């Protein structure tokens, strides 16, 4: 099966649809999280009274980034082309749902996605857990293998693999994770060109 034949596309947000601007090392320092710890998993493991102010800080920090979001090369054209072809489109992000909506609005893509098909860290387990993709597959009435997960990091590809979906790596010059996917495009414009 070719990617062009697939009709159900799910996108990561930051670094995939947007130009990546998160400084995760600085976020870890600000929240006193060890350098090697996953931010969301670390916060989830904290007692509620310790996690609450850190989550609030993270949400406000990410809000500033969401309002200033800029599209990754070719992202607008890719999403619009897929919508024009009648594809179902979703977002699966480790960001908050409300900020995903702000980001899509800032990019001019808000009308391309049904809000219920935008899953953030509170609507689905954070990637690489496959729960978000499985939720969208069920909602859309398709097998997970009918989904394409487009992302810029191994968590996106691991999520796709665990769900049984197709994973596509974008916005990197090379594919450092060949064991997770053969589908790779240097950016979203190149991915659109591959679709023909």
PLM features per residue range, with description:
Residues 1-50, 56:
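Active-site neighborhood of HAD-like aspartate-dependent phosphohydrolases
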């Amino acid at each position: 099966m070719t990617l062009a034949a697939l009709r159900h596309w799910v996108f990561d947000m930051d670094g995939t649809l947007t130009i990546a601007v998160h400084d995760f090392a600085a976020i870890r320092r600000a929240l006193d999280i060890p350098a090697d710890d996953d931010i969301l998993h670390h916060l989830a493991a904290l007692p509620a009274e310790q996690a609450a102010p850190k989550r609030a800080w993270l949400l406000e920090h990410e809000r500033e980034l969401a309002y200033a979001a800029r599209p990754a090369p070719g992202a607008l054209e890719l999403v619009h082309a897929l919508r024009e072809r009648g594809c179902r489109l979703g977002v699966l992000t480790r960001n908050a749902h409300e900020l995903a909506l702000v980001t899509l609005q800032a990019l001019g893509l808000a009308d391309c996605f049904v809000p219920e098909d935008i899953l953030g860290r509170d609507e689905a387990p954070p990637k690489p857990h496959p729960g978000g993709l499985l939720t969208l597959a069920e909602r859309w009435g398709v097998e997970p293998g009918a989904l394409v997960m487009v992302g810029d990091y191994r968590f996106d590809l691991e999520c796709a693999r665990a769900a049984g979906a197709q994973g596509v790596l974008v916005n990197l010059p090379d594919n450092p994770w060949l064991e997770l996917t053969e589908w790779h495009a240097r950016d979203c414009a190149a991915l659109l060109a591959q679709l023909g």
